[in-house]
Regions:
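Internal hydrophobic alpha-helix adjacent to the cofactor/substrate pocket in enzyme cavities
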Residues: 379-400
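Beta1/beta-strand and adjacent pyrophosphate-binding region of the FAD-binding site
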Residues: 4-18
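Extended, charge-enriched "interface" segments that sit outside catalytic cores
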Residues: 431, 437, 448-453, 457-609, ...
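A glycine-rich dinucleotide-binding beta-alpha-beta segment and adjacent secondary-structure elements
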Residues: 307-373, 401-414, 533-587, 592
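Conserved N-terminal/central alpha/beta ligand/cofactor-binding core
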Residues: 3-7, 24-132, 142, 154-174, ...
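Short hydrophobic core segments
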Residues: 13, 145-156
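An anion/pyrophosphate-binding glycine-rich loop and adjacent beta-alpha core
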Residues: 39-41, 57, 84, 184-321, ...
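Glycine-rich phosphate/pyrophosphate-binding beta-alpha loops
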Residues: 369-377, 433-435
Protein backbone atom coordinates (compact mmCIF):
# COMPACT_ATOMS: atom_id res chain seq x y z
CA UNK A 1 0.00 0.00 0.00
CA UNK A 2 1.29 3.46 -0.91
CA UNK A 3 2.12 5.84 1.92
CA UNK A 4 2.84 9.59 2.04
CA UNK A 5 6.55 10.12 2.72
CA UNK A 6 7.09 13.88 2.49
CA UNK A 7 7.03 17.11 0.46
CA UNK A 8 9.77 18.88 -1.47
CA UNK A 9 10.15 22.04 -3.53
CA UNK A 10 12.55 20.33 -5.93
CA UNK A 11 13.00 16.59 -6.47
CA UNK A 12 15.94 15.32 -8.51
CA UNK A 13 15.71 11.81 -9.96
CA UNK A 14 19.26 10.52 -10.36
CA UNK A 15 22.50 11.36 -8.54
CA UNK A 16 24.98 11.39 -11.40
CA UNK A 17 26.81 14.50 -12.58
CA UNK A 18 23.62 16.23 -13.77
CA UNK A 19 21.59 15.35 -10.69
CA UNK A 20 24.32 16.48 -8.29
CA UNK A 21 24.70 19.98 -9.76
CA UNK A 22 20.91 20.35 -10.02
CA UNK A 23 20.27 19.34 -6.42
CA UNK A 24 23.12 21.36 -4.92
CA UNK A 25 22.09 24.49 -6.83
CA UNK A 26 18.42 24.24 -5.86
CA UNK A 27 19.24 23.58 -2.20
CA UNK A 28 21.76 26.43 -2.00
CA UNK A 29 19.14 28.78 -3.44
CA UNK A 30 16.88 27.95 -0.48
CA UNK A 31 14.59 25.25 -1.88
CA UNK A 32 13.77 22.15 0.13
CA UNK A 33 15.32 19.55 -2.15
CA UNK A 34 15.61 15.77 -2.42
CA UNK A 35 17.93 13.77 -4.65
CA UNK A 36 16.97 10.16 -5.31
CA UNK A 37 19.39 7.44 -6.41
CA UNK A 38 19.02 3.70 -6.95
CA UNK A 39 22.34 3.13 -5.16
CA UNK A 40 23.93 5.63 -2.78
CA UNK A 41 27.35 4.10 -3.45
CA UNK A 42 27.04 5.29 -7.06
CA UNK A 43 26.60 9.02 -6.35
CA UNK A 44 28.78 10.94 -8.80
CA UNK A 45 29.95 7.70 -10.37
CA UNK A 46 32.30 7.89 -13.37
CA UNK A 47 31.34 4.65 -15.15
CA UNK A 48 33.41 5.43 -18.23
CA UNK A 49 36.65 7.45 -18.36
CA UNK A 50 38.37 8.35 -15.06
CA UNK A 51 38.83 11.97 -16.13
CA UNK A 52 37.14 15.35 -16.13
CA UNK A 53 37.48 17.96 -18.88
CA UNK A 54 38.98 17.69 -22.34
CA UNK A 55 38.41 19.66 -25.54
CA UNK A 56 35.42 22.01 -24.98
CA UNK A 57 34.49 19.94 -21.92
CA UNK A 58 37.16 21.77 -19.93
CA UNK A 59 35.42 25.01 -20.91
CA UNK A 60 32.16 23.67 -19.47
CA UNK A 61 33.83 22.71 -16.18
CA UNK A 62 35.36 26.19 -15.83
CA UNK A 63 31.96 27.76 -16.56
CA UNK A 64 30.21 25.52 -14.03
CA UNK A 65 32.77 26.63 -11.45
CA UNK A 66 32.45 30.30 -12.40
CA UNK A 67 28.70 30.04 -11.71
CA UNK A 68 29.19 28.34 -8.34
CA UNK A 69 28.85 24.68 -9.36
CA UNK A 70 30.95 21.96 -7.75
CA UNK A 71 32.37 19.74 -10.52
CA UNK A 72 35.61 21.69 -10.99
CA UNK A 73 36.45 22.04 -7.29
CA UNK A 74 35.76 18.36 -6.67
CA UNK A 75 37.87 17.33 -9.67
CA UNK A 76 40.73 19.40 -8.22
CA UNK A 77 40.36 17.64 -4.87
CA UNK A 78 40.58 14.24 -6.60
CA UNK A 79 43.07 15.01 -9.37
CA UNK A 80 45.85 12.58 -10.32
CA UNK A 81 47.29 14.27 -13.40
CA UNK A 82 46.48 17.46 -15.29
CA UNK A 83 47.21 18.44 -18.90
CA UNK A 84 46.28 21.42 -21.05
CA UNK A 85 45.17 20.10 -24.43
CA UNK A 86 45.68 21.86 -27.79
CA UNK A 87 48.56 24.04 -26.60
CA UNK A 88 49.90 24.11 -30.15
CA UNK A 89 46.74 25.87 -31.32
CA UNK A 90 45.12 29.20 -30.49
CA UNK A 91 43.80 30.06 -27.00
CA UNK A 92 40.17 29.56 -28.06
CA UNK A 93 40.66 25.79 -28.09
CA UNK A 94 43.00 25.37 -25.11
CA UNK A 95 41.17 22.89 -22.85
CA UNK A 96 42.09 21.47 -19.46
CA UNK A 97 41.77 17.73 -18.83
CA UNK A 98 42.47 15.99 -15.53
CA UNK A 99 42.79 12.34 -14.59
CA UNK A 100 40.86 11.83 -11.36
CA UNK A 101 40.53 9.19 -8.68
CA UNK A 102 37.04 8.02 -9.66
CA UNK A 103 36.14 6.41 -6.32
CA UNK A 104 37.35 9.42 -4.36
CA UNK A 105 35.37 11.73 -6.66
CA UNK A 106 32.20 9.77 -5.94
CA UNK A 107 32.88 9.75 -2.19
CA UNK A 108 33.68 13.48 -2.01
CA UNK A 109 30.57 14.43 -4.02
CA UNK A 110 28.37 12.21 -1.85
CA UNK A 111 29.72 13.89 1.28
CA UNK A 112 29.10 17.37 -0.15
CA UNK A 113 25.48 16.40 -0.77
CA UNK A 114 25.14 15.00 2.75
CA UNK A 115 26.49 18.22 4.26
CA UNK A 116 24.36 20.56 2.14
CA UNK A 117 21.60 22.39 4.00
CA UNK A 118 18.07 21.95 2.53
CA UNK A 119 19.12 18.76 0.70
CA UNK A 120 18.14 15.15 1.48
CA UNK A 121 19.95 12.25 -0.20
CA UNK A 122 17.67 9.21 -0.46
CA UNK A 123 18.29 5.73 -1.83
CA UNK A 124 15.10 4.92 -3.70
CA UNK A 125 14.09 3.89 -7.20
CA UNK A 126 11.44 6.23 -8.58
CA UNK A 127 8.95 4.09 -10.52
CA UNK A 128 6.19 6.61 -11.26
CA UNK A 129 5.83 10.36 -11.83
CA UNK A 130 2.24 11.61 -11.77
CA UNK A 131 1.12 15.14 -12.66
CA UNK A 132 -1.00 16.78 -9.95
CA UNK A 133 -2.68 20.15 -9.58
CA UNK A 134 0.20 21.60 -7.56
CA UNK A 135 3.12 19.74 -9.11
CA UNK A 136 4.02 16.05 -9.23
CA UNK A 137 3.74 12.95 -7.08
CA UNK A 138 6.78 10.67 -7.13
CA UNK A 139 6.29 7.02 -6.14
CA UNK A 140 9.20 4.75 -5.18
CA UNK A 141 9.54 1.01 -5.59
CA UNK A 142 8.92 0.75 -1.83
CA UNK A 143 5.56 2.53 -2.40
CA UNK A 144 6.58 5.79 -0.74
CA UNK A 145 4.88 8.85 -2.29
CA UNK A 146 6.56 12.26 -2.33
CA UNK A 147 4.67 15.45 -3.19
CA UNK A 148 6.94 17.78 -5.19
CA UNK A 149 6.47 21.24 -6.70
CA UNK A 150 9.10 20.65 -9.40
CA UNK A 151 10.95 17.57 -10.67
CA UNK A 152 14.26 17.23 -12.51
CA UNK A 153 14.82 13.97 -14.38
CA UNK A 154 18.53 13.12 -14.54
CA UNK A 155 18.53 9.36 -15.05
CA UNK A 156 21.70 9.10 -17.15
CA UNK A 157 22.09 5.71 -18.83
CA UNK A 158 20.06 3.91 -16.13
CA UNK A 159 16.60 4.52 -17.65
CA UNK A 160 15.69 1.22 -19.30
CA UNK A 161 19.39 0.33 -19.32
CA UNK A 162 20.45 -2.82 -21.18
CA UNK A 163 24.02 -4.14 -21.37
CA UNK A 164 25.43 -5.84 -24.50
CA UNK A 165 28.59 -7.98 -24.59
CA UNK A 166 28.66 -10.10 -27.74
CA UNK A 167 25.72 -12.49 -27.77
CA UNK A 168 24.94 -11.72 -24.11
CA UNK A 169 22.51 -8.95 -23.15
CA UNK A 170 20.67 -8.19 -19.92
CA UNK A 171 18.91 -5.35 -18.12
CA UNK A 172 21.39 -3.29 -16.10
CA UNK A 173 22.75 0.14 -15.51
CA UNK A 174 26.50 0.85 -15.80
CA UNK A 175 28.95 -0.88 -13.44
CA UNK A 176 26.48 -3.68 -12.69
CA UNK A 177 24.07 -1.36 -10.86
CA UNK A 178 20.32 -1.96 -11.15
CA UNK A 179 18.62 -0.01 -13.97
CA UNK A 180 15.54 2.19 -13.65
CA UNK A 181 13.28 -0.47 -15.12
CA UNK A 182 9.82 0.99 -14.46
CA UNK A 183 10.12 4.77 -14.77
CA UNK A 184 10.29 4.76 -18.59
CA UNK A 185 6.75 3.43 -19.00
CA UNK A 186 5.51 6.08 -16.54
CA UNK A 187 7.19 8.86 -18.55
CA UNK A 188 5.71 7.53 -21.80
CA UNK A 189 2.29 7.45 -20.16
CA UNK A 190 2.84 11.04 -19.04
CA UNK A 191 3.49 11.96 -22.67
CA UNK A 192 7.25 12.51 -22.93
CA UNK A 193 8.78 11.70 -26.37
CA UNK A 194 11.29 8.98 -25.43
CA UNK A 195 13.74 7.21 -27.75
CA UNK A 196 16.75 4.88 -27.42
CA UNK A 197 20.40 5.88 -27.50
CA UNK A 198 23.51 3.78 -27.01
CA UNK A 199 26.98 4.32 -25.60
CA UNK A 200 29.81 2.09 -24.46
CA UNK A 201 32.90 1.80 -22.32
CA UNK A 202 36.30 0.05 -22.60
CA UNK A 203 37.60 -2.79 -20.46
CA UNK A 204 39.54 -2.29 -17.24
CA UNK A 205 42.72 -4.34 -17.00
CA UNK A 206 45.04 -5.30 -14.13
CA UNK A 207 47.99 -2.93 -13.77
CA UNK A 208 50.50 -5.67 -12.90
CA UNK A 209 49.62 -7.53 -16.11
CA UNK A 210 50.78 -4.62 -18.30
CA UNK A 211 54.34 -4.35 -19.63
CA UNK A 212 54.93 -0.62 -19.19
CA UNK A 213 58.46 -0.86 -20.65
CA UNK A 214 56.81 -1.25 -24.07
CA UNK A 215 54.66 1.87 -23.71
CA UNK A 216 55.15 5.57 -24.38
CA UNK A 217 54.92 7.64 -21.19
CA UNK A 218 52.51 10.58 -21.07
CA UNK A 219 53.33 12.96 -18.24
CA UNK A 220 51.17 15.76 -16.90
CA UNK A 221 51.92 19.49 -17.08
CA UNK A 222 54.16 21.01 -14.42
CA UNK A 223 52.85 22.84 -12.57
CA UNK A 224 49.37 21.37 -13.07
CA UNK A 225 46.51 23.83 -13.54
CA UNK A 226 43.27 23.58 -11.54
CA UNK A 227 39.73 23.79 -12.88
CA UNK A 228 38.36 25.87 -10.03
CA UNK A 229 39.07 29.54 -9.52
CA UNK A 230 38.97 28.74 -5.79
CA UNK A 231 41.83 26.22 -5.94
CA UNK A 232 45.13 27.95 -5.22
CA UNK A 233 47.59 25.05 -5.51
CA UNK A 234 47.13 21.53 -6.87
CA UNK A 235 50.54 20.27 -5.82
CA UNK A 236 52.29 17.86 -8.16
CA UNK A 237 50.99 15.28 -10.62
CA UNK A 238 50.60 11.93 -8.89
CA UNK A 239 50.55 9.47 -11.81
CA UNK A 240 51.70 8.92 -15.37
CA UNK A 241 49.53 7.78 -18.27
CA UNK A 242 50.76 5.66 -21.16
CA UNK A 243 50.18 5.35 -24.90
CA UNK A 244 50.13 2.33 -27.21
CA UNK A 245 48.88 1.52 -30.71
CA UNK A 246 46.83 -1.18 -32.38
CA UNK A 247 48.19 -3.01 -35.44
CA UNK A 248 47.17 -5.15 -38.43
CA UNK A 249 46.70 -8.23 -36.25
CA UNK A 250 44.32 -6.30 -33.98
CA UNK A 251 42.38 -5.15 -37.02
CA UNK A 252 42.17 -8.67 -38.46
CA UNK A 253 40.65 -10.08 -35.25
CA UNK A 254 37.97 -7.38 -35.33
CA UNK A 255 37.13 -8.08 -38.98
CA UNK A 256 36.92 -11.84 -38.37
CA UNK A 257 34.49 -11.35 -35.47
CA UNK A 258 32.47 -8.33 -36.56
CA UNK A 259 29.35 -10.49 -37.01
CA UNK A 260 29.48 -11.16 -33.24
CA UNK A 261 29.16 -7.46 -32.46
CA UNK A 262 25.56 -6.74 -31.35
CA UNK A 263 25.85 -3.38 -33.09
CA UNK A 264 26.55 -4.97 -36.47
CA UNK A 265 24.26 -7.94 -35.82
CA UNK A 266 21.32 -5.54 -35.47
CA UNK A 267 20.65 -6.32 -31.79
CA UNK A 268 21.26 -2.74 -30.68
CA UNK A 269 18.54 -0.33 -31.80
CA UNK A 270 19.83 2.76 -30.03
CA UNK A 271 21.84 5.42 -31.88
CA UNK A 272 25.47 5.62 -30.73
CA UNK A 273 27.79 8.61 -30.30
CA UNK A 274 29.41 9.79 -33.55
CA UNK A 275 32.46 11.26 -31.81
CA UNK A 276 33.11 8.40 -29.39
CA UNK A 277 32.65 5.25 -31.50
CA UNK A 278 33.41 1.71 -30.36
CA UNK A 279 36.74 0.24 -31.44
CA UNK A 280 35.06 -2.13 -33.91
CA UNK A 281 33.17 0.86 -35.33
CA UNK A 282 36.50 2.67 -35.87
CA UNK A 283 37.86 -0.36 -37.74
CA UNK A 284 34.78 -0.59 -39.99
CA UNK A 285 34.54 3.16 -40.64
CA UNK A 286 38.27 3.73 -41.21
CA UNK A 287 39.40 0.50 -42.88
CA UNK A 288 42.36 2.20 -44.57
CA UNK A 289 43.84 3.40 -41.29
CA UNK A 290 46.73 1.06 -40.33
CA UNK A 291 46.60 1.67 -36.57
CA UNK A 292 44.67 3.41 -33.80
CA UNK A 293 46.00 5.07 -30.65
CA UNK A 294 44.92 4.09 -27.16
CA UNK A 295 45.66 5.65 -23.78
CA UNK A 296 46.20 3.56 -20.65
CA UNK A 297 45.00 5.52 -17.63
CA UNK A 298 44.86 4.72 -13.89
CA UNK A 299 41.44 4.69 -12.21
CA UNK A 300 42.75 5.76 -8.81
CA UNK A 301 45.54 5.54 -6.24
CA UNK A 302 44.00 2.70 -4.24
CA UNK A 303 43.13 0.41 -7.15
CA UNK A 304 45.05 -1.61 -9.74
CA UNK A 305 42.39 -1.03 -12.43
CA UNK A 306 43.65 0.61 -15.62
CA UNK A 307 41.31 2.17 -18.16
CA UNK A 308 41.91 1.64 -21.90
CA UNK A 309 40.84 4.97 -23.39
CA UNK A 310 39.72 4.63 -27.01
CA UNK A 311 38.93 0.90 -26.85
CA UNK A 312 35.18 0.83 -26.17
CA UNK A 313 33.67 -2.41 -27.48
CA UNK A 314 30.60 -4.64 -27.38
CA UNK A 315 32.36 -7.72 -28.78
CA UNK A 316 32.35 -10.96 -26.73
CA UNK A 317 34.74 -11.03 -23.78
CA UNK A 318 37.00 -13.70 -25.33
CA UNK A 319 37.31 -11.63 -28.52
CA UNK A 320 38.20 -8.56 -26.46
CA UNK A 321 40.99 -10.52 -24.78
CA UNK A 322 42.29 -11.70 -28.17
CA UNK A 323 42.59 -8.24 -29.67
CA UNK A 324 43.98 -6.65 -26.47
CA UNK A 325 46.73 -9.30 -26.50
CA UNK A 326 47.87 -8.12 -29.95
CA UNK A 327 48.70 -4.65 -28.61
CA UNK A 328 52.20 -3.76 -27.46
CA UNK A 329 52.37 -3.75 -23.66
CA UNK A 330 49.06 -5.59 -23.31
CA UNK A 331 50.24 -9.01 -24.59
CA UNK A 332 49.53 -10.62 -21.20
CA UNK A 333 46.91 -8.24 -19.80
CA UNK A 334 44.15 -9.54 -17.53
CA UNK A 335 40.66 -8.13 -18.05
CA UNK A 336 39.15 -7.15 -14.69
CA UNK A 337 35.95 -5.69 -16.19
CA UNK A 338 35.00 -6.38 -19.80
CA UNK A 339 34.03 -3.62 -22.20
CA UNK A 340 30.32 -3.32 -22.95
CA UNK A 341 27.72 -1.30 -24.82
CA UNK A 342 24.70 0.07 -22.98
CA UNK A 343 21.37 1.07 -24.50
CA UNK A 344 19.05 3.42 -22.61
CA UNK A 345 15.97 5.64 -22.85
CA UNK A 346 16.30 9.39 -23.31
CA UNK A 347 14.01 12.22 -24.37
CA UNK A 348 13.81 14.41 -27.46
CA UNK A 349 15.21 17.76 -26.19
CA UNK A 350 13.11 19.67 -28.73
CA UNK A 351 10.29 19.17 -26.21
CA UNK A 352 12.07 21.59 -23.85
CA UNK A 353 12.50 25.30 -23.36
CA UNK A 354 15.98 26.86 -22.92
CA UNK A 355 15.38 26.62 -19.16
CA UNK A 356 15.30 22.80 -19.66
CA UNK A 357 11.67 22.79 -18.52
CA UNK A 358 9.33 20.73 -20.69
CA UNK A 359 7.05 22.95 -22.78
CA UNK A 360 3.95 20.87 -22.09
CA UNK A 361 4.70 19.99 -18.46
CA UNK A 362 5.15 22.96 -16.17
CA UNK A 363 7.57 22.24 -13.35
CA UNK A 364 9.12 19.18 -15.04
CA UNK A 365 12.75 19.51 -16.13
CA UNK A 366 15.34 17.24 -17.76
CA UNK A 367 19.14 17.21 -17.52
CA UNK A 368 22.15 15.26 -18.75
CA UNK A 369 22.09 12.10 -20.84
CA UNK A 370 18.33 11.95 -20.38
CA UNK A 371 18.28 15.02 -22.67
CA UNK A 372 20.26 13.25 -25.39
CA UNK A 373 23.76 14.49 -24.57
CA UNK A 374 26.89 12.48 -23.75
CA UNK A 375 29.63 13.13 -21.21
CA UNK A 376 29.97 14.00 -17.54
CA UNK A 377 30.64 17.68 -18.22
CA UNK A 378 27.68 18.21 -20.54
CA UNK A 379 25.51 16.52 -17.92
CA UNK A 380 26.78 18.67 -15.05
CA UNK A 381 26.25 21.87 -17.08
CA UNK A 382 22.63 20.95 -17.82
CA UNK A 383 22.08 19.92 -14.22
CA UNK A 384 23.15 23.38 -13.09
CA UNK A 385 20.79 25.03 -15.60
CA UNK A 386 17.85 22.82 -14.58
CA UNK A 387 18.55 23.21 -10.85
CA UNK A 388 18.75 26.99 -11.09
CA UNK A 389 15.54 27.26 -13.10
CA UNK A 390 13.58 24.80 -10.96
CA UNK A 391 14.53 26.95 -7.96
CA UNK A 392 13.59 30.15 -9.81
CA UNK A 393 10.14 28.69 -10.52
CA UNK A 394 9.60 27.68 -6.89
CA UNK A 395 10.82 31.06 -5.62
CA UNK A 396 8.74 33.04 -8.12
CA UNK A 397 11.83 34.60 -9.71
CA UNK A 398 12.58 35.18 -13.40
CA UNK A 399 14.02 32.17 -15.26
CA UNK A 400 17.72 32.19 -16.18
CA UNK A 401 18.40 31.61 -19.88
CA UNK A 402 22.04 31.14 -20.87
CA UNK A 403 22.90 32.90 -24.11
CA UNK A 404 25.06 30.98 -26.61
CA UNK A 405 27.10 34.16 -27.14
CA UNK A 406 28.07 34.24 -23.46
CA UNK A 407 28.91 30.62 -22.62
CA UNK A 408 29.44 27.09 -23.85
CA UNK A 409 26.65 26.17 -21.44
CA UNK A 410 24.35 28.42 -23.47
CA UNK A 411 25.61 26.88 -26.71
CA UNK A 412 24.99 23.36 -25.39
CA UNK A 413 21.45 24.08 -24.22
CA UNK A 414 20.56 26.13 -27.31
CA UNK A 415 21.78 23.37 -29.62
CA UNK A 416 19.75 20.74 -27.77
CA UNK A 417 16.45 22.64 -27.56
CA UNK A 418 16.72 24.32 -30.99
CA UNK A 419 18.41 21.72 -33.20
CA UNK A 420 17.66 18.57 -31.23
CA UNK A 421 19.90 15.52 -30.95
CA UNK A 422 19.59 12.58 -33.33
CA UNK A 423 22.61 11.00 -31.66
CA UNK A 424 24.34 11.53 -28.28
CA UNK A 425 25.38 15.20 -28.34
CA UNK A 426 28.99 16.00 -27.52
CA UNK A 427 30.29 19.48 -26.84
CA UNK A 428 33.07 20.67 -29.18
CA UNK A 429 34.71 24.07 -29.60
CA UNK A 430 33.60 24.05 -33.26
CA UNK A 431 29.96 24.19 -32.12
CA UNK A 432 30.44 27.77 -30.91
CA UNK A 433 30.61 30.60 -33.42
CA UNK A 434 31.93 32.84 -30.61
CA UNK A 435 34.74 30.61 -29.31
CA UNK A 436 37.41 33.32 -29.26
CA UNK A 437 35.45 35.23 -26.61
CA UNK A 438 34.25 32.06 -24.85
CA UNK A 439 37.69 30.88 -23.77
CA UNK A 440 38.22 28.78 -20.68
CA UNK A 441 40.60 31.36 -19.17
CA UNK A 442 37.87 34.05 -18.97
CA UNK A 443 34.94 31.92 -17.75
CA UNK A 444 34.89 33.82 -14.44
CA UNK A 445 34.81 37.18 -16.22
CA UNK A 446 31.81 36.04 -18.28
CA UNK A 447 29.76 34.21 -15.65
CA UNK A 448 30.77 34.96 -12.05
CA UNK A 449 28.70 38.19 -11.89
CA UNK A 450 25.67 36.14 -13.00
CA UNK A 451 26.45 33.45 -10.42
CA UNK A 452 26.55 36.14 -7.74
CA UNK A 453 23.24 37.69 -8.87
CA UNK A 454 21.57 34.27 -8.85
CA UNK A 455 22.88 33.54 -5.36
CA UNK A 456 25.38 30.73 -5.96
CA UNK A 457 28.55 32.84 -5.61
CA UNK A 458 29.24 34.13 -2.10
CA UNK A 459 29.98 37.79 -1.40
CA UNK A 460 33.49 36.82 -0.29
CA UNK A 461 34.24 35.01 -3.53
CA UNK A 462 32.73 37.83 -5.56
CA UNK A 463 34.97 40.37 -3.80
CA UNK A 464 38.00 38.27 -4.75
CA UNK A 465 36.77 38.21 -8.35
CA UNK A 466 36.36 42.01 -8.40
CA UNK A 467 39.87 42.40 -6.96
CA UNK A 468 41.24 40.17 -9.72
CA UNK A 469 39.50 42.29 -12.37
CA UNK A 470 40.99 45.42 -10.80
CA UNK A 471 44.50 43.90 -10.86
CA UNK A 472 44.00 42.92 -14.49
CA UNK A 473 43.03 46.50 -15.38
CA UNK A 474 46.05 47.87 -13.49
CA UNK A 475 48.38 45.47 -15.30
CA UNK A 476 47.01 46.51 -18.69
CA UNK A 477 47.54 50.18 -17.78
CA UNK A 478 51.11 49.38 -16.65
CA UNK A 479 51.89 47.80 -20.01
CA UNK A 480 50.50 50.87 -21.78
CA UNK A 481 52.53 53.32 -19.70
CA UNK A 482 55.84 51.44 -19.42
CA UNK A 483 58.34 52.42 -22.14
CA UNK A 484 61.33 50.20 -22.97
CA UNK A 485 64.48 52.00 -24.13
CA UNK A 486 66.68 50.60 -26.94
CA UNK A 487 69.65 49.10 -25.06
CA UNK A 488 72.07 46.39 -26.20
CA UNK A 489 70.51 43.95 -23.69
CA UNK A 490 67.00 44.64 -24.97
CA UNK A 491 67.92 44.28 -28.64
CA UNK A 492 69.91 41.12 -27.96
CA UNK A 493 66.78 39.55 -26.44
CA UNK A 494 64.63 40.73 -29.34
CA UNK A 495 67.03 39.30 -31.93
CA UNK A 496 67.18 35.97 -30.04
CA UNK A 497 63.39 35.82 -30.41
CA UNK A 498 63.68 36.49 -34.16
CA UNK A 499 62.01 39.89 -34.05
CA UNK A 500 63.35 43.29 -35.09
CA UNK A 501 65.43 45.56 -32.87
CA UNK A 502 64.09 48.86 -31.55
CA UNK A 503 65.77 52.21 -32.18
CA UNK A 504 63.61 54.36 -29.92
CA UNK A 505 61.45 53.88 -26.83
CA UNK A 506 58.60 51.39 -27.29
CA UNK A 507 55.71 50.66 -24.95
CA UNK A 508 55.58 47.19 -23.42
CA UNK A 509 52.08 46.67 -24.82
CA UNK A 510 53.38 47.28 -28.36
CA UNK A 511 56.19 44.76 -27.88
CA UNK A 512 53.61 42.30 -26.57
CA UNK A 513 51.65 42.62 -29.82
CA UNK A 514 54.54 41.07 -31.73
CA UNK A 515 53.83 37.36 -32.47
CA UNK A 516 57.26 36.30 -31.16
CA UNK A 517 56.91 38.06 -27.81
CA UNK A 518 54.87 37.44 -24.70
CA UNK A 519 55.24 37.63 -20.94
CA UNK A 520 57.76 34.79 -20.89
CA UNK A 521 59.98 36.29 -23.62
CA UNK A 522 59.90 39.74 -22.01
CA UNK A 523 60.64 38.69 -18.43
CA UNK A 524 64.26 40.02 -18.49
CA UNK A 525 63.18 43.28 -20.14
CA UNK A 526 60.13 43.92 -17.97
CA UNK A 527 61.77 45.12 -14.75
CA UNK A 528 58.62 46.47 -13.03
CA UNK A 529 56.44 43.37 -13.46
CA UNK A 530 54.35 42.67 -10.32
CA UNK A 531 53.68 39.26 -8.73
CA UNK A 532 50.24 38.27 -10.01
CA UNK A 533 48.05 35.21 -10.52
CA UNK A 534 49.25 33.48 -13.74
CA UNK A 535 45.63 33.55 -14.96
CA UNK A 536 45.76 37.38 -14.97
CA UNK A 537 48.89 37.39 -17.15
CA UNK A 538 47.25 34.84 -19.47
CA UNK A 539 44.07 36.90 -19.91
CA UNK A 540 45.99 40.14 -20.45
CA UNK A 541 48.31 38.60 -23.06
CA UNK A 542 45.46 36.98 -25.00
CA UNK A 543 43.49 40.23 -24.90
CA UNK A 544 46.43 42.14 -26.38
CA UNK A 545 47.45 39.66 -29.06
CA UNK A 546 43.94 38.91 -30.31
CA UNK A 547 42.39 42.34 -29.76
CA UNK A 548 41.30 42.83 -33.38
CA UNK A 549 39.73 39.39 -33.69
CA UNK A 550 38.03 39.70 -30.30
CA UNK A 551 36.51 43.08 -31.20
CA UNK A 552 35.24 41.66 -34.50
CA UNK A 553 33.60 38.74 -32.68
CA UNK A 554 32.06 41.04 -30.07
CA UNK A 555 30.39 42.96 -32.91
CA UNK A 556 28.93 39.67 -34.17
CA UNK A 557 27.63 39.02 -30.66
CA UNK A 558 25.92 42.42 -30.60
CA UNK A 559 24.27 41.74 -33.96
CA UNK A 560 22.91 38.42 -32.72
CA UNK A 561 21.66 39.98 -29.48
CA UNK A 562 19.55 42.39 -31.52
CA UNK A 563 17.70 39.32 -32.84
CA UNK A 564 17.56 37.67 -29.40
CA UNK A 565 15.57 40.61 -27.95
CA UNK A 566 12.88 40.29 -30.64
CA UNK A 567 10.51 38.03 -28.70
CA UNK A 568 8.09 35.65 -30.42
CA UNK A 569 4.70 34.67 -28.94
CA UNK A 570 4.82 31.37 -27.01
CA UNK A 571 1.66 29.65 -28.26
CA UNK A 572 1.39 31.02 -31.77
CA UNK A 573 0.31 29.02 -34.84
CA UNK A 574 2.88 29.79 -37.55
CA UNK A 575 0.52 28.48 -40.22
CA UNK A 576 -1.16 31.88 -39.96
CA UNK A 577 1.88 33.70 -41.38
CA UNK A 578 1.76 33.93 -45.16
CA UNK A 579 5.10 33.65 -46.92
CA UNK A 580 6.67 31.06 -44.62
CA UNK A 581 7.70 27.85 -46.35
CA UNK A 582 5.92 24.65 -45.26
CA UNK A 583 9.06 23.18 -43.64
CA UNK A 584 9.64 26.39 -41.69
CA UNK A 585 6.04 26.40 -40.43
CA UNK A 586 6.33 22.80 -39.27
CA UNK A 587 9.66 23.38 -37.48
CA UNK A 588 8.54 26.64 -35.87
CA UNK A 589 5.30 25.07 -34.62
CA UNK A 590 7.22 22.13 -33.18
CA UNK A 591 10.03 24.04 -31.46
CA UNK A 592 8.18 27.25 -30.55
CA UNK A 593 11.31 29.48 -30.43
CA UNK A 594 11.37 32.23 -27.83
CA UNK A 595 12.86 34.85 -30.15
CA UNK A 596 14.05 35.58 -33.69
CA UNK A 597 17.62 34.63 -32.79
CA UNK A 598 16.60 31.13 -31.73
CA UNK A 599 14.33 30.80 -34.77
CA UNK A 600 17.25 31.63 -37.09
CA UNK A 601 19.20 28.63 -35.74
CA UNK A 602 16.47 26.05 -36.41
CA UNK A 603 17.36 23.58 -39.15
CA UNK A 604 14.93 24.11 -42.02
CA UNK A 605 14.27 27.80 -41.29
CA UNK A 606 15.96 29.84 -44.03
CA UNK A 607 17.14 33.49 -44.00
CA UNK A 608 14.12 34.25 -46.22
CA UNK A 609 11.82 32.78 -43.55
CA UNK A 610 13.49 34.97 -40.93
CA UNK A 611 12.84 38.04 -43.10
CA UNK A 612 9.15 37.06 -43.28
CA UNK A 613 9.08 36.63 -39.48
CA UNK A 614 10.70 40.03 -38.92
CA UNK A 615 8.14 41.76 -41.17
CA UNK A 616 5.26 39.95 -39.47
CA UNK A 617 6.65 40.78 -36.01
CA UNK A 618 6.97 44.49 -36.85
CA UNK A 619 3.39 44.58 -38.18
CA UNK A 620 2.10 42.66 -35.17
CA UNK A 621 3.85 45.02 -32.73
CA UNK A 622 2.34 48.06 -34.50
CA UNK A 623 -1.15 46.52 -34.25
CA UNK A 624 -0.69 46.00 -30.53
Amino acid sequence: MNYFAGEYDVAVVGAGHAGIEAALAAARLGCKTAIFTINMDAVGNCPCNPSIGGTAKGHLVREIDALGGKMGKTADECFLQSRMLNRGKGPAVHSLRAQIDRRKYSSVMKHKIELQKNLDLRQAEITDIEKTEGGYNLTTRMLAVFKCKTVIIATGTYLGGRIFVGEVSYESGPDGIFPAAFLGSSLKKLGLPLRRFKTGTPARVLKSSIDFSELEVQKGDEPPQPFSYETENLGENKVECHISWTNDETKQIILENINRSPLYAGKIEGVGPRYCPSFEDKIMRFKDKPRHQLFIEPCGLDTEEMYLQGMSSSLPEEVQLKFYHTIKGLEHCLIMRPAYAIEYDCVDPLAMNPTLEFKDFEGLFGAGQFNGSSGYEEAAAQGLVAGINAAMKVLGREPVIFDRSESYIGTLVDDLVTKGANEPYRMMTSRSEYRLVLRQDNADERLTPLGHRIGLISDERYEKFLKKQELKKEELNRLKSTVISPTDEVNEILVSRETSEITSGVRLIDLMKRPQLGYDALKNIDKTRPELDPNIFEQVEIGIKYEGYIQKQLKQVEQMKKLEVKQLPKDFDYNEIEGLRLEAREKLNKIKPLNIGQASRISGVSPADISVLLIWLAQNNRRQ
